[in-house]
């Protein structure tokens, strides 16, 4: 199905909108990006769902990609991103499935504690520090060497080492070099404050009434040595009925060769809601 695209601005935040020629699905979809990324990371999924009649959107948090730059990253915390999400969802309207990846997985869960959404897809999220401690999971130490992130003026600086980006974000042999070029070009700064606040953030699962689909991941692929899949722990805490491990696939599976396999999995779940 044909579709049109546009950039919709809500305050200082920009949304990418893929509008199908005929909206045949009874749910809209909002894709939320991960740390240092933007709506561009969801380009394949946006076109996939728009072609199938879904009114599809992707947000850029303040200071990211198409949104207005942030003057002071130290003023940007979790509450600011939750405000961006609320403004975006008010603009979109209707019944919306919200997809969060990595950093934004916990953000969309926190949002859903106090807002109604049609469903939540939580992809390769972290879990709160308190839940790790409750389950007796040892926290990994900070990364060293090339993997250590530089922080300047409250902002986490994006990694520009090509081989490190490939190792951390993609499965070996599952991504073309043009996609790696895109990621290196497009990755931007992230709020260090948000990263710290997310780790300390508490979730109240009983407040989340929307159906939840949790997608797990082998954290060793991004240099984290953990005894369990954190997303399985999260799914159990949320009492989520739907849980699946993304495999084969790297952290940025939505940009890998087999991205369509996962888009189809999303579609099956969305259609069941």
Where would I find each of the regions flagged by the language model?
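Flexible "cap/lid" loop of the alpha/beta hydrolase fold
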Residues: 120-152, 194-195
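Short beta-strand/loop motif that positions the catalytic acidic residue
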Residues: 208, 214-216
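Catalytic histidine-centered segment of alpha/beta-hydrolase-like enzymes
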Residues: 249-260
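Gly/Ala-rich beta-loop-alpha elbow adjacent to hydrolase catalytic centers
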Residues: 99-104, 108
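Conserved alpha/beta-hydrolase
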Residues: 46-70
């Amino acid at each position: 199905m044909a579709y049109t695209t546009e950039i919709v601005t809500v305050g200082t935040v920009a949304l990418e909108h893929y509008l199908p020629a005929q909206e045949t699905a009874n749910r809209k979809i909002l894709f939320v990006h991960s740390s240092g990324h933007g709506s561009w990371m969801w380009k394949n999924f946006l076109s996939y769902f728009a072609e199938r009649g879904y009114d599809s959107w992707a947000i850029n948090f303040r200071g990211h990609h198409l949104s207005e730059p942030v003057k002071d990253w130290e003023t940007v915390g979790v509450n600011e991103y939750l405000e961006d999400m609320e403004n975006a969802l008010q603009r979109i309207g209707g019944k919306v499935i919200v997809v969060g990846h990595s950093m934004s997985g916990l953000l969309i869960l926190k949002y859903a504690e106090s807002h109604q959404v049609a469903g939540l897809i939580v992809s390769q999220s972290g879990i709160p520090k308190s839940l790790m401690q409750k389950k007796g999971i040892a926290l990994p130490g900070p990364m060293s060497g090339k993997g250590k992130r530089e922080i300047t003026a409250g902002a986490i600086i994006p990694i520009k080492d090509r081989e490190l980006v490939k190792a951390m974000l993609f499965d070996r042999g599952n991504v073309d070099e043009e996609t790696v070029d895109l990621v290196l070009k497009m990755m931007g700064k992230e709020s260090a404050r948000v990263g710290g606040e997310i780790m300390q953030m508490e979730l109240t699962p009983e407040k989340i009434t929307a159906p939840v689909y949790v997608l797990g991941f082998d954290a060793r692929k991004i240099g984290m040595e953990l005894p369990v899949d954190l997303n399985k722990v999260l799914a159990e805490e949320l009492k989520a009925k739907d849980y699946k491990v993304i495999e084969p696939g790297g952290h940025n599976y939505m940009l890998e060769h087999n991205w369509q396999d996962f888009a189809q999995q999303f579609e099956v779940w969305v259609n069941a809601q």
